[in-house]
């Protein structure tokens, strides 16, 4: 359980041993105390997932969000996902994942680029739409924010995608309308 939390973005029920979630159910508080004492972090345990959220001074391997242009884009994409859930357009399952058609997910990415692309770094701003969609999806999959299933043409959005969101400051948004 420790290794899964330390070396991945999150743990999800159904991916790995069910005993891991039973362990969290009974020993989660003690595990949280151990991790919080040894690292600057917090353990977030939910019904179908658990996350090891690092503090600003904690540097254990690669972290998300990084100080990169793609991290900014992914944070804004996570905000778009949250908007769709809050509006009722996308509905979470019992395990807090969201299953959406691949075309709907890709349309959301295109909409994000159209609305916010002026603020992206040059490489992403000038990138063709199809390449932008592929790169954003690949990066989201790398950080286990989503899982694409080409066979069923669906995207599973993991709960971690709703934990962090980003947007441009209001003064920037108003200036670029």
Predicted regions and their residues:
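Short, cationic-aromatic polyanion-contact patches
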Residues: 152-176
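A glycine-biased, small/acidic residue-tolerant capping/turn segment at secondary-structure junctions
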Residues: 119-120, 151-153
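Short beta-strand "wing" residues that participate in macromolecule-binding interfaces
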Residues: 147-148
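Non-catalytic recognition/regulatory regions in large multidomain proteins
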Residues: 1-107, 112-139, 143-144, 161-163, ...
